[in-house]
Structures are given as C-alpha cells and as structure tokens.
Amino acid sequence: MNAMLNIKEGEFTSTIYTLIHEHKFNDAIRILQYQHERNPKNLAALSLLAYCYYYTQDFMNAADCYSQLSYNFPQYSQYKLYHAQSLYNAFRPADALAVVSMIQDENLLNESVKLEAAIKYQEDDLVNCRILVEQLPENDAAVIINTACIDYKEGNYEEALKKFNEATEFSGYQSGLAYSIALCHYRRGDYDSALKLISEIINRGVKDHPEFNIGMVTEGIDVNFIQNTQKLHESALIEAFNLKFAIYYRTKDFKAAKESLTDMPPRNEHDADPITLHNLAISNANSDFGDSSAKLQFLLGINPFPQETFANLLFLYCKNDYFGLAADVLAENPSHTFYCLNEYQFNLLEALIYMPTNPEESLKKLEKLEKECLDRLRKTAIEIQIKKEQKTTDSDDSLEMRNLIESYDDSLEMYLPVLMTYAKYYWDKRDYQAVEKLFRNSVDYCKEHDTWKLNVAHTIFMQEKKYKDAAAFYEPIVHKKYDDGILEVPAMILANLVVCYIMTNQTDEAELILKAVENEEEAALMMKPNEKFFHNSIISLVIGSLYCSKGNFEFGISRVVKALEPPEKKLGVDTWYYAKRCIVAAIELMAKNLLVMRDSVVMEVIQFLTSCEVPGRNIYTVPDDLFEQAGESKVKCNVTYEARMIKAALLMVFND
C-alpha cells in the first residue's frame, strides 16, 4: 500500500499530518480511506478520516465515521458528541437529538446541552432552546451568543445586537460575530453600519487568506476553485459576501450585487451553499431564465433551502408566462405553500396563475390586494409626514425615519406587481387606453419609480401617435446611464426611444444614442472579445422593423440584414426573432403579389439566411431546458432549421 501511494516506510503518520497541515484534505482522505478498508477498526485512521470529512464540510461521511468510532470505541464518549455534531451540521436534527440523548459523560454535559439547544434552534423550537441555554453558565461567551441568536430569530434585533457586541467584548474579534452584528444592522435597516462590518470581514480575509482568491474572478483572472473547509467557514467570507449582495440587491444596485457574488472565494457550482446558489439564480433571472429556474428547482429538493426560494421560483414562472408550471409546483408542495408564502404572496400568485382561465376571480383578488396595498401606502405616507414635521436631529429618530421610508418603499414594491398584473390584463386585450388610465390613477404613489415610468412609456408608445410623450418617460431612464453604462439599459428601451425620435423628426438625438451604444459595445468587445453584444443589433433591427411596418421593405430588410453582420457575433435568440419576423412578412406579401422586391435585395436576404446556418446550430428558438420532449423536436427548434425553411420559402416565391 505504501509503495502504491508513494509513502516511505515509517513515514505514514508524518505524511498524513503534513497533508492535513497543508490543507490537502482530498489526498489525506484518499490514503485514509484505503487504510480504513484494510483495517476497519484502526482508531487512528478512522478518527483522522472523520476529522478530514468534517473539516471539508462533508458532514454525512463524518457522521458515518464517528458512528463507527462511537460503536467500536464506546470508552471515548467524545465520539458520540462528534457524531451528533456531524448529524446536526448535516441538517438531521432528529437523528442528532437521538445521539445526544445517549451521552452519559458528565464532562460533556455542557457541550451536550449546547448542542441540544442548537438542534432545537434548528427546528425553530425557540421556547425549549431558551430553556436549555438558561441551564448553562452565564459567563460563557457561547451562551451569550446563543441567547443573541434566539433574540434574533424572535425578531428582537436590538437585543440581539447588544448581546453580540457583548460577546465580542468578552472573546475578542471573530469574523462570525462580526457577521452576526452586520446581520442585525441589516435587519434594522442600518445598511451603512452593516457594510462597514462586511468590509472589515473581507479586508481581513484578503490579508489573512490570500489562498481564497478573493475578488480575482471579478477582475477576470483565472484562478483555481477552492474547497469548502472549516477555515473558509470560520472566516465568514461567504456569509459576508451574500449579505453584501442582499443589501445591494435590496437597494437596486444590481451591478454591485453581482460583483458581490463574483468577488467571493471561487468555488465549483456543486460546492456552492444554498444561499449562494439562490442569490446566483435571482441575479441572473432576467438574462437566463433556464439556468435560474433550474437552480431554484434544485434548491427545493434539498434540506434546508432558503425560504425565499419557493416564492421566487413561482414568480419567475409567472413572469415568463409558465402559469401551468407554477400551478403544478404550488399544488405539489402544500407544506412549502404554508411555510414559505405569506398571505400577500399566495393571493398574488393565485391571481397570476388563474388569470388566463378565470380572469373574473383573479381580478377580484387583485382588487382586494390593491385596496390593502394602497391603505398601507397611505398610512406610511402619513407617518412619514408627521415625522418630517417634528424635525429632530436625534440619530435614533433618523434611523426611524429611514425605516419608515424603507417601509413605504416595501409597500410600493408590493403594490406595483398588483398594478402591473391588472395592467397586463388590459394590455393583452390591446386596450392601451385602459392601461394608461390605470397608471394615471396610481401616479401619486408611483411617479418616481422606474418600473412605473417604463411601463407608462411602453403603453404610450403602443398608441403610436404619442411618440413625444413616450420619449419623455423613456428619457430619464436612459439618461441615467447615458455617459457610463448605457449597455445596462435594456436594448428594447433604447430601441423604442430611438423610434420615438425618428417618428418625431429628432434624428440628431437618435444618432447620439446609436453612437453611444456603438462606442460602448466596441469598448466592451475589446475587454471581452469572446462575448456577444446585441444592443446595437437590436436597435437597428427595431428600426428596420419600423420601416417594414410602414411598407418600405427594401430599406427595412437591408437594415435588418446589416444589423446581424457578422452572424457569428450578432446572431442570438432575440436578434433572430426580429430578423425572421420582417423576412417572413415580406415573403407573405410577395406570395400574395402585394410586394415586389429588387433581385439584389432578395439575393442579399438569401445570402444572409445561408450565413446563419452554421452559427445558428446551437441557438435554440424555444427554451431548451424544461420543455424539450424529444430529440427530433429539438432539431427543428434552432436557427439553422428555421433559416433553411425560410430560405426555401423565399426561393419558392422568388422563382414562381
């Protein structure tokens, strides 16, 4: 065995301890597993194997090893405690409690009570958890921390904050404690204090653990993934970055939120903890529905998962019009429905899901929700006004005012989905005047909100003759990012604004936007040469579509074709969708003898469709993750297949 593993005789023990000291746990585990297979009752090998599993957060394998140790060596009571701790960390509270109850050693009494309290805490049995904690010595920092955790879970954040600070004074700086204090500040709405503590945790991590490669992924540096280890856990870095993400996501600084995730120590996706996986899913929900929904679905299958997962998955399905899937998930998970959704979320989801089949009932639910949301908004607005009139400079009052404003913003965020669901009902009926009336009635509460402005702009835009008014709503959204970050503005917003300018003869303003997008795409392409950028293409496609809709197909289609040059760089699901719409519309009119196009334009289109065949093989025109039924259907749902079919139809009409 030693020869096979290249370990010299007499150096086995020193080799194992060296590997552990150098944090090469996988190598140590491989050797110890082999040794354990040869001699299952070797105490040293099995205890070291258990330690390595525990240190690398593989708690189920650690529990299995400690179970064998406690059975084969009952004289060592600590193995039962370690067995229970492993089960607790593997989220097996009932099994952990059963093992704890078998520990008889008086020397382990305090540790056993602490673990039993932690198990009760994990099960949300806070009453018995507090009873157990109160049995422990008061001068123990762990007891102060445990009491603080109970206060936190009960929602008493002020008291929890005091106790965490007391524990820090008692035991000195610890990253885990600093994170707990930051979390209390976050719950209190004091984001500045939370971010200050998070920065300290991260700075210490950068200084003390350069091997964690903090921030290097954001800078585009290729680095090795790191493992989940006890050292990483003790640094509280993952928790700190996730809290930083939560703060920026809540304050709608989505760019900084994404950077929080890429800054954290890089790990393989299968090593990511549930919180990180959840945050990755929601951060990419708008750009990659398939990946986000897959992550959220996966999280629902593990225990525990972040409570927000269930609601976020359901709302993601509804946002993308997969109401049947949302209904199935809701029906298949009644326990999740009870524990993970509040009354507002449940009622809104029901209204969304049943709107296509039972609009009358859905509208009744929306009407009730709207009344509740507006009542809450009015009440909070009055409280804010009263507070403003008092004009105190006390810091506690300042925090209270901030919390009131945040409460108002939260109420507004609850009202907007209700309003938009209402609006969508009329939008789908193309009753844009009814939609505009709805938005006009909500102007007092929503006029400063970008989502409201954007949807008002879309509604006015669709009424065609109000392009100047639509531009007035689009402009503030675009101008925020005009000089730096215009690519962060969705391409359709830019395209609609350009169309507004064209239709109101403001060609100079339209050219300025096109030039700004072109310049930023060129700069971005230099930074990321292998990435595709579609903003300029989509804007040009929309302009081309506009000319086609006005009957000028030759100019419109030429603009569309040029927008996708070269196809290997510009072809994507969205760009192909707009391009094929114009071409198919032209073919239909040609087939009806209502349109004649010059031969040169037709040949240009044929050449374009041919050039799309190779890069279009892996670009699917329908979601390819959830709904693929068979290999044959998948073959027919890519750009290559559609380009060939359209080319065949065009040639048939052209040669007729």
From Swiss-Prot:
BP term (GO), one: intraciliary transport
Disruption phenotype: Sensory neurons are unable to take up a fluorescent dye from the media, a phenotype that is often associated with aberrant sensory cilia.
TPR repeat residues: 9-42, 43-76, 141-174, 176-208, 238-271, 378-412, 416-449, 451-484, 537-570
Location(s), subcellular: Cell projection, Cilium
Any single GO CC term annotated in Swiss-Prot or TrEMBL for this entry: intraciliary transport particle B
Keywords: Cell projection, Cilium, Cilium biogenesis/degradation, Repeat, TPR repeat
SMART domains named in the record: TPR (SM00028)
Tissue specificity remark: Expressed in most amphid, both phasmid and several labial-quadrant neurons.
One Gene Ontology molecular-function label: intraciliary transport particle B binding
Pfam family membership, one: TPR_19
UniProt-listed InterPro entries: TPR-like_helical_dom_sf (IPR011990), TPR_rpt (IPR019734), TT30 (IPR039941)
Assembly behavior: Component of the IFT complex B composed of at least che-2, che-13, dyf-1, dyf-3, dyf-6, dyf-11, dyf-13, ift-20, ift-74, ift-81, ifta-2, osm-1, osm-5 and osm-6.
Functional note: Plays a role in anterograde intraflagellar transport (IFT), the process by which cilia precursors are transported from the base of the cilium to the site of their incorporation at the tip. Specifically required for the kinesin osm-3 to dock onto and move the IFT particles which contain these precursors. Component of the intraflagellar transport (IFT) complex B required for transport of proteins in the motile cilium. May be required for ciliary entrance and transport of specific ciliary cargo proteins such as che-3 which are related to motility.
Similarity field: Belongs to the TTC30/dfy-1/fleer family.
Entry protein name: Tetratricopeptide repeat protein 30 homolog
Species of provenance: Caenorhabditis elegans
Gene name linked to the record: dyf-1
